[in-house]
């Protein structure tokens, strides 16, 4: 399954890790650990924020990813299952059966 992990770093802590040089180390380690399809960084609501896209079948994903971001960045974290076009197509192909069985 594919997931989008969104995070926002509190301003004060973000300033601290940028000044100390830790931010580069943390993001490099996240990339090594999570092996994401993509990582994007941007300002959102006045905070340093980002989105990480990963594939995982691990039921412990929320804990594993959340703890890295909470401990490493003091971040607010949101984890959302997402689909690409192929995933959506597979789901839609099953839609007829679901409608037939549950309507």
Q: Can you describe what each PLM-predicted range is?
A:
Residues 1-103:
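Conserved, structured core segments of small domains
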């Amino acid at each position: 399954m594919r997931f989008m992990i969104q995070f926002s770093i509190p301003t004060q802590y973000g300033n601290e890790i940028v000044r100390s040089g830790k931010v580069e180390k943390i993001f490099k380690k996240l990339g090594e650990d999570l092996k994401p399809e993509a990582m994007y960084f941007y300002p959102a609501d006045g905070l340093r924020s980002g989105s990480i896209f990963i594939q995982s079948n691990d039921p412990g994903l929320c804990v594993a990813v959340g703890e890295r971001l909470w401990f490493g960045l003091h971040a607010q974290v949101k984890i959302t299952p997402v689909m690409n076009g192929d995933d959506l197509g597979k789901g839609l192909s099953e839609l007829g059966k679901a409608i037939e069985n549950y309507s």
